[in-house]
Amino acid sequence: MAASAAVFSRLRSGLRLGSRGLCTRLATPPRRAPDQAAEIGSRGSTKAQGPQQQPGSEGPSYAKKVALWLAGLLGAGGTVSVVYIFGNNPVDENGAKIPDEFDNDPILVQQLRRTYKYFKDYRQMIIEPTSPCLLPDPLQEPYYQPPYTLVLELTGVLLHPEWSLATGWRFKKRPGIETLFQQLAPLYEIVIFTSETGMTAFPLIDSVDPHGFISYRLFRDATRYMDGHHVKDISCLNRDPARVVVVDCKKEAFRLQPYNGVALRPWDGNSDDRVLLDLSAFLKTIALNGVEDVRTVLEHYALEDDPLAAFKQRQSRLEQEEQQRLAELSKSNKQNLFLGSLTSRLWPRSKQP
């Protein structure tokens, strides 16, 4: 019995050791070669990191294609709508179609040609003046027509726009406007020719001219649009260019007739400004001297940065020269009078019987 018990205990301990070894082998993964392990790891990481793309979706390229298709459809629809709206015949007040020169063409050609003509005329309306004769004919007797025409810009010459948080946009009147109008109205036909729109400029002109010195008003639609500038074409004024003076703060405004213009510096709103008084004296001097062609005078000041300052310097120099001439003349007259009185004393005239 003792021997059998010893054998049984040995068998039981052997079974325990065998089961432990089997469990250890099952729990421990089999060893692999280093290259094979790295390859498996990289495959696993690639699968873990890569986007899980679902079937049927194409990513950003699909959205881009859809956007392009929608833009193309909208553009085509807009083009067809424009051709349909502007390509029809104009109608009269009764709703009847007005025939034009395109009626004999095919319908599609009619639509396209009318649309092209509409936009061409619209562009021409922006670029060209509204009329080749912007002003009516000069007044005839017994009415009075001033001998010269003065063309004035509004913004920068007569007014200065200012903006504040409390009041918004306001226009400040330049000092000397009343004096300018009063002194030049008998000599010049005053015309406001501004690059502002009529809706903006009309009430401003009413505020600066309550007494009605301004004869005519011309706005942006009367200018000629060239290279981004609104140019005032003197040849469209229906006046003699030899007697037209343009005052503006931009030389581009009278680029077609550079010797008809006086370019002033834009007014910055300074209340002590006296430019309009100097301008009045300058233009009054031209008119009172009866200059036949103002371009011969304005040509001398075309290259000056400040034409009015140059005029004042020349005027001051001429006054000094005139004073010297008068002083010399007065001195010579006094000498002649002295010699004449001495001669009469020496050789008295014989009395007539």
UniProtKB/Swiss-Prot annotation:
Ranges that cross the membrane: 66-86
UniProt-annotated stretches for the region Disordered: 25-60
GO MF term list: cysteine-type endopeptidase activator activity; interleukin-2 receptor binding; phosphoprotein phosphatase activity; protein serine/threonine phosphatase activity; protein tyrosine phosphatase activity; ribonucleoprotein complex binding; RNA binding
Domain FCP1 homology positions: 143-286
Membrane topology note: Single-pass membrane protein
Result after altering R114Q: In MGCA9; uncertain significance
Subcellular location: Mitochondrion inner membrane
Annotated Pfam families: NIF
Consequence of changing R113C: In MGCA9; likely pathogenic; severely decreased protein abundance in homozygous patient cells; results in reduced protein import into mitochondrial matrix
Mitochondrial intermembrane compartment segments: 87-353
CDD domains: HAD_FCP1-like
Documented effect of changing T149M: In MGCA9; uncertain significance
Biased composition regions of type Low complexity, renumbered to the chain: 49-60
Function: Essential component of the TIM23 complex, a complex that mediates the translocation of transit peptide-containing proteins across the mitochondrial inner membrane. Has some phosphatase activity in vitro; however such activity may not be relevant in vivo.
Similarity-based family: Belongs to the TIM50 family.
Disease link: 3-methylglutaconic aciduria 9: An autosomal recessive disease characterized by early-onset seizures, severely delayed psychomotor development and intellectual disability. Patients have hypotonia or spasticity, and laboratory investigations show increased serum lactate and 3-methylglutaconic aciduria.
Subunit details: Component of the TIM23 complex at least composed of TIMM23, TIMM17 (TIMM17A or TIMM17B) and TIMM50; within this complex, directly interacts with TIMM23. The complex interacts with the TIMM44 component of the PAM complex and with DNAJC15.
Name the UniProt record assigns to this protein: Mitochondrial import inner membrane translocase subunit TIM50
Species of provenance: Homo sapiens (Human)
Gene name, Swiss-Prot/TrEMBL: TIMM50
